[in-house]
Amino acid sequence: MNLLIMGLPGAGKGTQAEFIVKNYGVNHISTGDMFRAAMKNETEMGKLAKSFIDKGELVPDEVTNGIVKERLAQDDIKASGFLLDGYPRTIDQAHALDTMLEELGIKLDAVVNIVVNPDILVDRLSGRYICRNCGATYHKIFNPTKVEGVCDVCGSHDLYQRADDVPETVKNRLDVNIKESAPIIEHYTELGLVKNIEGEQEISQVTEDIKKVLG
């Protein structure tokens, strides 16, 4: 089985990716893992990627695409299939993936898209706060302090939010993700591959829904 998994930050993609890999025995391919392996093994594309990273420059699409193709050409993919996570990030990368899969003789079976209302994601992602005194982390919804405004660990009243976790910053980050992912989802929808999964349910129910669509 050859799959893509998509979903906005905070949608629970990582949890469901773990389930899919364990349940269906496919190879979990994340962008970060691919880059690290290619550079460690000094593949042609890995060396190219390292040259850009060492200069502090963004790795161009053709190099990223090349690293993905190197990984998809390996024997374990032919044997067990894959779950691609974190790629494609742009519509150009999606078209490049179509081409490389065709060249490798690999068929994409489904795109699992975990759908959550962005407003809910803002609450999920912007709820984190930290004790400045001891570093304990909390979440206003999922892991609140026992007494509001007081750290459970050290009793400090000095709790703060990182700039990255402020609602406005989170919303801006989600807006960028939505803009980039919308044409990719539209592309795979036209190909009849998208399986939309309601991600606002309990984690176990999201997992059950994925099992239903993948069989």
Swiss-Prot record:
Species: Lactococcus lactis subsp. lactis (strain IL1403) (Streptococcus lactis)
EC number: 2.7.4.3
Subunit and partners: Monomer.
GO CC term (a single one): cytoplasm
Domain notes: Consists of three domains, a large central CORE domain and two small peripheral domains, NMPbind and LID, which undergo movements during catalysis. The LID domain closes over the site of phosphoryl transfer upon ATP binding. Assembling and dissambling the active center during each catalytic cycle provides an effective means to prevent ATP hydrolysis. Some bacteria have evolved a zinc-coordinating structure that stabilizes the LID domain.
Catalytic activity from the UniProt record: AMP + ATP = 2 ADP
Alphabetical UniProt keywords: ATP-binding, Cytoplasm, Kinase, Metal-binding, Nucleotide biosynthesis, Nucleotide-binding, Transferase, Zinc
Positions with a binding annotation for Zn(2+): C131, C134, C151, C154
A Pfam family reported for this protein in Swiss-Prot or TrEMBL: ADK
UniProt xrefs under HAMAP family: Adenylate_kinase_Adk
InterPro entries, sorted: Adenyl_kin_sub, Adenylat/UMP-CMP_kin, Adenylat_kinase_CS, Adenylate_kinase_lid-dom, P-loop_NTPase
Region annotation LID: where it falls in the sequence: 127-165
Protein family membership: Belongs to the adenylate kinase family.
One GO term of the biological process aspect: AMP salvage
Region annotated NMP, chain positions: 30-59
Described purpose of this protein according to its UniProt entry: Catalyzes the reversible transfer of the terminal phosphate group between ATP and AMP. Plays an important role in cellular energy homeostasis and in adenine nucleotide metabolism.
Binding of ATP, residues: G10, A11, G12, K13, G14, T15, R128, T137, Y138, Q201
Protein name from the UniProt record: Adenylate kinase
A single GO molecular function term of this UniProt record: adenylate kinase activity
Residues the entry annotates as binding AMP: T31, R36, E57, L58, V59, G86, Y87, P88, R89, Q93, R162, R173
Pathway(s) annotated for this protein in UniProt: Purine metabolism; AMP biosynthesis via salvage pathway; AMP from ADP: step 1/1
Major site of localization recorded for this protein: cytoplasm
